[in-house]
């Protein structure tokens, strides 16, 4: 699995971006959001149980990610048509404010090293900086949903470019190593 310091792979995927007729799909690639932070997360498959809770939670925080100049991008190995059908079918996904990318050939999940032995994407999330370098990566067991608020907290910490202690949140003091070494 790619990790901190690795370049995020190049990709080009079709995404479901809307339920509005004629506006449903867009092509998204590694340059689409160039110069922005990116929150890229994968889920195993559509029409399941844990996945929509995470996707909806990332959607509810989308504005907060956008306020930090970060674009949320989600994907699975399902096609854009399956994503569209799921969005249409699931109340919590209808108005999703970010693209649901279709990695139907499994190229991105393979390049990231998150394709499971079962052929499905592992439940992974990556924070990618403006230079397309991975600054955070996490994967959980398929039965355990991620916490998008924690991903937002880590993004905040990364954007300070300072030392942030355990459980640090935006607005709190960061660590001053000079003062700490001086015993202050």
Model-derived regions: residue spans:
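Chalcogenol-based redox active-site neighborhoods
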Residues: 1-184
């Amino acid at each position: 699995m790619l990790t901190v310091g690795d370049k995020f792979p190049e990709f080009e995927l079709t995404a479901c971006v809307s339920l509005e007729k004629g506006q449903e799909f867009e092509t998204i690639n590694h340059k689409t959001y160039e110069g922005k932070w990116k929150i890229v997360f994968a889920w195993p498959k559509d029409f399941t149980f844990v996945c929509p809770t995470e996707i909806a939670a990332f959607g509810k925080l989308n504005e907060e990610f956008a306020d930090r100049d970060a674009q949320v991008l989600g994907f699975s190995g399902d096609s854009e048509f399956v994503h569209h059908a799921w969005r249409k079918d699931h109340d919590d996904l209808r108005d999703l404010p970010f693209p649901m990318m279709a990695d139907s050939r499994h190229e991105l999940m393979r390049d990231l090293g998150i394709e499971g032995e079962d052929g499905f994407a592992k439940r992974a999330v990556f924070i990618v900086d403006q230079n397309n370098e991975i600054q955070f990566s996490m994967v959980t067991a398929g039965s355990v949903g991620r916490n998008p608020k924690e991903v937002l907290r880590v993004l905040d910490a990364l954007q300070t470019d300072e030392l942030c202690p355990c459980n640090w949140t935006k607005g709190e003091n960061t660590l001053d190593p000079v003062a700490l070494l001086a015993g202050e």
